[in-house]
Amino acid sequence: MTGQQRALRWLAAGVLVLWCGGFLRAENTEKSMVRALILTPPTVAVQSWMVSLLYQFPEAAADASDAAAKVQLCTGQGNTLQTALTEAERGLPRKASYRLCEYLLLNAETTLKTIRQAETVLKEEPVQGLSARVLCMDLSGEELAAADGENELFPEQLLQVVKEAAPQAPHLYESRNALLAPVLILTDGAIENAEEMLLLTETGNTRLTPAESQMAQLLLGQSGEHTFPLDGGQVTFRRCVVSVEAVEDGFAVTLTGQRRAGTALPTAAQCAALEQLCVQTVQRCWENGYDLLSLGAVRALKQGTGREALTTKNACPQVQADVSFLQF
């Protein structure tokens, strides 16, 4: 190898090292990592969009969702969602990166129409947030800003509660005709996950009761334990298999559950109460525009597509539920 070749190799190696160093610095320390987007649509009182960003800087730029940098909050307002987002980004110490943005928080007064508007913006670069988990907050943008001003740890606490509630939350891309989202509330300055869930449909928003919320999650097959306070004590489903069958003009819903270890087998009266709650939840969702168990699809599979499609525009069909638990 000649001296000129060695010099060229050393030069190439030096350029590579400099490029790698610059790339790593740009990726890992020079960006504000947005962890959650908080959207508040226009209201009668405030006729503009408000966007808040939960972010970490700079350590959070590592490729780990558990980055340890301090969580902070910045807010922007604008006549459109895009201008409000741009204004919020101006409050960041560095350019925004949405690589770790896994959550979309919406005001509890948000409609499905608002979510459609948000999808249009969030699917674009650089956000690309259609896979984000959707949660609702029972507080306005002003209340959010006030809570942040009173407690410097509020953003950290908010992100922690969001993470805990995330398994119950749907992805944004799942919000075709309806969305069933957990609700965060502010109590004595602390943020917490409410027991009720919010059903957003084309016809409006409906707040489910705590029992209906648990049953809806169970019927949707969401993982985790589901507990119901009933006469005679709590009943907890550790696991549950849900089956739906079209029977004549109605439907039969069967829930076969496994109880929590160390608990007594639920009584016949408790199973009957759960059956009633199941029917009540399915009917309430249907009446508010949400086919919780995809009954229309079940009917179409059995009868074919030649007959009139069953949708929530029709009266809710008869639903009969049967709840049983395994002996072990």
Question: For the regions a protein language model found, what residue spans apply to each?
Answer:
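Membrane-proximal alpha-helical signals and transmembrane carboxylates
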Residues: 2-328
